[in-house]
């Protein structure tokens, strides 16, 4: 352990791993892997609470989570590089179980006295895992051999003292390692779908080795959140931004359950909404929520702010900033308002900052967590910021929200502005609304609305020549986007039936006179994002 402390540069900290609190958790240290959030999802699916934190997070920042074990994620670095990120020494001193994945395994090796070197035989993609031992808790119930997903260019040349190889692949003699102190390493990614039995390993680690209990439920989360909201708000006043989506609906319902009439909901029509969206949203909220709701017509204000702007990142910044200004204006009218409630989710937080880890790059700003001006006078309250989308839906069901709201497809905070390539104008908004209405109508008619994660139209800035009747046309190109996903962190393009795509295309070019060409986006995430901007 002295080796680990010296290599991490950390001082020894006194840790009592046996302290009992109301919650137990798995803490995941992020080293910059694109799959880090998937690890968290897999643990949450087991009804065990977990959090993803930066690899250099000090003990005092996670002690309240009552960790029962640690997972070290993968990452793009090599542990033998001078500035390579390493795990804090306290995870080894805690006597708690540790599981390193890919780079995390190499960090364990390096910090505990082993040797990691560059490999001439890199492994990227599928491999077959073969066990070296008959009985091991970590690999219990794993098929022999088992397909796994590899993504590494370094290898373990020498195991740390006390460790042994538990499994191997054709090009990797140490694909799984472990010692008698329940410190393990995997040279593959058990969290991805390409490792079909990877969940077995994670379950073995969480339940059999860390001895966690599957007791983290949305019912428990509601009670805990209500207590936290009451403590945070006190006798203050809260305004909540309603969008009509499940996120803001759940936030409003949860906060209202906690503080009642201390909450005022504000619905802003920014002119970037879909057809009939404002009317439908107000109808649902007034009939099912029983809350104080203020409707704000800010169409002119938003469209003027967006005039001449074509850069997608700038659009998001402007819209986010304008939203806050609107809420500040409304807060002044209402009197003393202390908090702004938002439906920020865990993936929003991860994508918008330079990751939880300092080792990966920012993808793009999110409306809920980006574009906020430095002078913002309202304090934020974000009770969903550690939840995934599917967890928010479960929470909404637990709170008694109508299915129409719970299962509504995600709609971005910046609205149609980021589905119009180039400058946003009133004319383009009407064109896109008409095309999008057709897409949604036909998707619902085909009973595929709940089979896809999102489906929508994009108005591109491309125009092309066409022929309608005896006349030449020069119209816009509209793209159709439909994806399947679990959490929006990764997504695959939806294999919609050709007949359905044909119907949608024919309706758009015949009913939206400004459009004469329709294409279907067959890109997955990654490398593309779900939204075009």
Curated annotation (Swiss-Prot):
Residues involved in ATP binding: 243-249
Pathway the protein contributes to: Purine metabolism; GMP biosynthesis; GMP from XMP (L-Gln route): step 1/1
Stretches assigned to the Glutamine amidotransferase type-1 domain: 25-215
InterPro entries: Class_I_gatase-like (IPR029062), GATASE (IPR017926), GMP_synth_C (IPR001674), GMP_synth_GATase (IPR004739), GMP_synthase (IPR022955), GMPS_ATP_PPase_dom (IPR025777), NAD/GMP_synthase (IPR022310), Rossmann-like_a/b/a_fold (IPR014729)
EC numbers, comma separated: 6.3.5.2
Function statement: Catalyzes the synthesis of GMP from XMP.
Protein name: GMP synthase [glutamine-hydrolyzing]
Organism: Dehalococcoides mccartyi (strain CBDB1)
């Amino acid at each position: 352990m002295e080796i680990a402390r010296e290599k991490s540069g950390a001082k020894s900290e006194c840790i009592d791993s046996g302290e009992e609190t109301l919650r137990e958790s798995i803490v995941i240290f992020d080293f910059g892997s694109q799959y880090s959030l998937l690890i968290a999802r897999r643990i949450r699916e087991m009804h065990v609470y977990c959090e993803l934190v930066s690899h250099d997070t000090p003990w005092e920042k996670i002690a309240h989570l009552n960790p029962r074990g640690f997972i070290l994620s993968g990452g793009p670095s090599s542990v033998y590089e001078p500035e390579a990120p390493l795990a804090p020494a306290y995870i080894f001193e805690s006597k708690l179980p540790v599981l390193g994945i890919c780079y995390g395994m190499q960090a364990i090796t390096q910090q505990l006295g082993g040797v990691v070197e560059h490999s001439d035989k890199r492994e990227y993609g599928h491999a077959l895992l073969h066990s070296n031992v008959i009985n091991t808790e970590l690999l219990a119930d794993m098929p022999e051999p088992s397909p796994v997903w590899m993504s590494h260019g370094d290898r373990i040349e020498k195991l740390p003292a006390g460790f042994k190889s538990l499994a191997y692949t054709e090009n990797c003699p140490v694909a799984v390692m472990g010692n008698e102190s329940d410190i393990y390493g995997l040279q593959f990614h058990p969290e991805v779908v390409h490792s079909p039995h990877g969940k077995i390993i994670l379950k073995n680690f969480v339940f059999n080795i860390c001895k966690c209990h599957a007791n983290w439920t949305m019912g428990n989360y509601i009670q805990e959140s209500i207590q936290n909201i009451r403590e945070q708000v006190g006798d203050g006043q809260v305004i909540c931004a309603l969008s009509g989506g499940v996120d803001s609906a759940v936030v409003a319902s949860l906060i209202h359950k906690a503080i009642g009439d201390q909450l005022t909901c504000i619905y802003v029509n920014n002119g970037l909404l879909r057809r009939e969206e404002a009317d439908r949203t107000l109808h649902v909220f007034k009939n099912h929520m029983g809350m104080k709701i203020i409707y704000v017509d800010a169409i002119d204000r938003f469209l003027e702010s967006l005039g001449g702007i074509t850069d997608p990142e700038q659009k998001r910044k402007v819209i986010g900033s304008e939203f806050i200004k609107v809420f500040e204006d409304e807060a002044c009218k209402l009197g003393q308002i202390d908090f702004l409630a938002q439906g920020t989710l865990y993936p929003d937080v991860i994508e918008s900052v330079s990751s939880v880890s300092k080792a990966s790059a920012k993808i793009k700003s999110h409306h809920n967590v980006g574009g906020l001006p430095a002078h913002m006078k309202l304090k934020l309250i974000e009770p969903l910021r550690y939840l995934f989308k599917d967890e928010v839906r479960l929470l909404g069901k637990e709170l008694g929200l109508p299915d129409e709201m719970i299962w509504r497809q995600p709609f971005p905070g910046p609205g149609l502005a980021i589905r119009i390539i180039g400058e946003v104008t009133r004319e383009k908004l009407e064109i896109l609304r008409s095309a999008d209405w057709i897409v949604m109508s036909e998707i619902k008619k085909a009973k595929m609305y709940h089979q896809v994660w999102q489906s929508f139209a994009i108005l591109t800035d491309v125009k092309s020549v066409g022929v309608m009747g005896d006349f030449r046309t020069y119209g816009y190109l509209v793209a159709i986007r439909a994806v399947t996903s679990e959490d929006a962190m990764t997504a695959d393009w939806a294999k919609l039936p050709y007949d359905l795509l044909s119907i949608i295309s024919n309706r758009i070019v015949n009913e939206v006179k400004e459009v004469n060409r329709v294409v279907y986006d067959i890109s997955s995430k990654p490398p593309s994002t779900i939204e075009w901007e």
